[in-house]
């Protein structure tokens, strides 16, 4: 696992086994410092069931899986949602996960998140931690956060990537001001990746039906 992560950061590229195309892992992939923070959040929360929106080149998924393995629960499972894996990314994210030996830990969904998340909710799935790095338009991020808030156990952690983007920060702001979520931590701000760790509400939603706070 660690050797695959170290190689990815050292080489910065990967050759797709599917079609031989060469892919630059960065800046699409998260930084080493964000990866470490993500892994530590998984460990700190003792997460067992995790979910990620946007597999991409798999750098974040590798760190999440590293955290799950460190937690040592045999029921650990990481769901990755990415409808573009076999097109834009040449299946490189899944390839790196296979090379790291964690394929059995990972469940890949090739549907768009706005389709997959309601289906998971309908089927009764539940998760302990989520990482959001998919569609960065406001409506996409908003839907991801709202559905994840229902899919995660109360008081769980959602880590949103690219918090520096207005669409992401505004969607997060709605959840903080209207849903009782708490901003637990943010990473160092830069123009490529800026993450925010959010804790969902712990109690029942007791808002009146007309409730709304400007965000």
What are these regions (language model features)?
Residues 1-30, 44:
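Rossmann-like AdoMet
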Residues 24, 28-215:
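S-adenosylmethionine/decaboxylated-SAM
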């Amino acid at each position: 696992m660690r050797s695959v992560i170290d190689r990815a950061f050292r080489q910065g590229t990967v050759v797709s086994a599917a079609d031989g195309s060469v892919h630059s892992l960065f800046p699409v992939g998260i930084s080493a410092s964000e990866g470490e923070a993500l892994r530590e959040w998984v460990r700190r929360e003792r997460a067992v069931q995790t979910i990620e929106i946007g597999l991409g080149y798999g750098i974040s998924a590798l760190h999440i899986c590293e955290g799950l393995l460190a937690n040592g629960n045999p029921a650990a499972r990481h769901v990755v949602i990415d409808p573009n894996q076999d097109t834009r990314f040449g299946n490189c994210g899944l390839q790196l996960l296979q090379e790291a030996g964690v394929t059995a830990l990972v469940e890949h969904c090739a549907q768009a998140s706005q389709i997959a998340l309601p289906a998971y909710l309908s089927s009764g799935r539940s998760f302990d931690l989520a990482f959001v790095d998919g569609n960065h338009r406001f409506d996409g991020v908003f839907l991801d956060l709202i559905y994840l808030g229902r899919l995660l156990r109360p008081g769980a952690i959602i880590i949103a990537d690219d918090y520096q983007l207005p669409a992401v920060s505004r969607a997060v702001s709605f959840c903080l001001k209207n849903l009782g979520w708490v901003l637990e931590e943010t990473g160092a701000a830069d123009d490529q990746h800026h993450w925010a760790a959010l804790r969902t509400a712990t109690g029942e939603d007791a808002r009146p039906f007309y409730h709304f706070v400007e965000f």
